Amino acid sequence: MSSSSKDIRVVCAIDFGTTYSGFAYAHIASPGEIITNETWPGQTGPLKTNTVLQYNDGFQDVELWGFPALAQKYSRRRKNDSKPLIKSTIDTRWPQIKFFKNVLIILTVPVEFSEKKKGIMKNCAFNAGLIKSITSSNLKFITEPEAAAIYCMRHLNEFSATKVGTSFLIVDIGGGTVDLTIRKLLSDNQLGEITEQTGDCCGGSFVDKEFINFLARKVGKSAMYLLKEYNYGILQYMVQEFCRSAKIPFTGNIKDFKTFELDLEELCPVLKDYVDDKTKKHLEKLEWVIDIEFEDVKAMFDSVVGRIIRLIRGQLDACKDCTAMFLVGGFSESKYLRKRIKEEFKKKVSIISSPDKPIAAVVRGALLYGLDTAIVKSRVLRYTYGIRSLPDWQHGDPVNRRTPDGKIFRFHTLIQRGQKVDVNKEVSDILRVAHANQKDMCMDLYVTRAYEAKYCDEPGVELLGKFTIKMPDKHLGLNRSVIYTLLFGETEIKATAKNQANGKEYHTTFELNFE
């Protein structure tokens, strides 16, 4: 642990997913004893629960959360009187721990999360009582594939693939999102990033959506709309039945398949009130039973699996030397998905495997990161960072951008997207005043997903933070400059501007987006 975290005694990692969520925790005195929570409302055993809240009619109070909120009928008599789960769990295990002082929270986020979205998550963590203040240093973020990579790094031992320089691909296939990253094993059990992290929304829940679309074709779009609107819990119960009976056991081998009989009269009798007369007559002939055949289920999978395979291919095209591929996340347990991935890439990657309990790989990896943040040595930037400069206007520059004194505001690049940076690496540049009588210099930091930018107001360029320094030595005229330095830390950027004339330094920090 770093010196700034000397008070930390317990690390708690939270994998807050779009479909399922979980948490794990450990005491720094016993880092090998990782505990993954498996006790949830209405469930005992699963390492995650559904990311669902059910509110009362006024949308003020949470009545149910987790699995009961998703697939059970609402009851006005049922109240959610349980204590906040994470706090109560840690308080019970270590009564002497002061939560706000001694607990470090590691929160996982999807790879595509922007600074704005991370800020929203931080604000939610504050409102949920996980941190004492919005500026607390006891909350850190890590991307889901990076956390999974840390967990899978240990899995390399099983294949004797622990040589320094070994590259491996992490494919985190969750319920909602799929995130990928290629990492390189460095000395001292550290990790470096080789390619930009990529991701898309094509996780396991999209197979569920294909099932709902299939059902809509059978009972009518209008009936499905009414079912979603007024009986969402019943619909989700049907989805769970589909998952249990058809989705989870599906291997892609027709010999293993048994026709799934969806009995609407038993599972969803309310549909009788929603279907039109023509559909009702047809379903009555079928005795309200819809047969779901092999080709039906395969079609539900294939559109989603195809998108995942394209994401994997994109990562492997960017890194020709990849020794292993690890599949993690809840949907990675799909036998059909694993089969398709192995068939597609077995000639390119010699090791295609999953670690123990792949559904918990992200949350356990996040916990390992919290216990030793130095495990991540380098990352690849997904943003270009720069400041607004004011050089002389040149022939060919837009006339409408010329200032009255013959200058032009430009985006001055400090470091470009796609570059690999070590944690705590410094990037510096010398910047000069634009006017002889200038009293201060604006060092506002801008970011863009583009590799290059000309102006700070062009589409895609966003202001990350404001930063101004004083330049009192006006007698030096234009012969004044500052050394502007960005230090890329674990979770934030530290900006330093040093006046070269008087040696005075100015500092500020910005939240870092390596995602």
How should each PLM-predicted stretch be described?
Residues 110-112, 146, 199-342, 390-398, ...:
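Gly/charged contiguous loops adjacent to phosphate- or pyrophosphate-bearing nucleotide/cofactor binding elements
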Residues 14-20, 145, 163-179, 183-186, ...:
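A short acidic Gly-Thr/Ser loop motif
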Residues 130-147, 339-365:
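Conserved phosphate-binding/catalytic loops in two-lobed NTP-binding clefts
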Residues 187, 266-307, 314, 374-515:
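Acidic low-complexity intrinsically disordered segments
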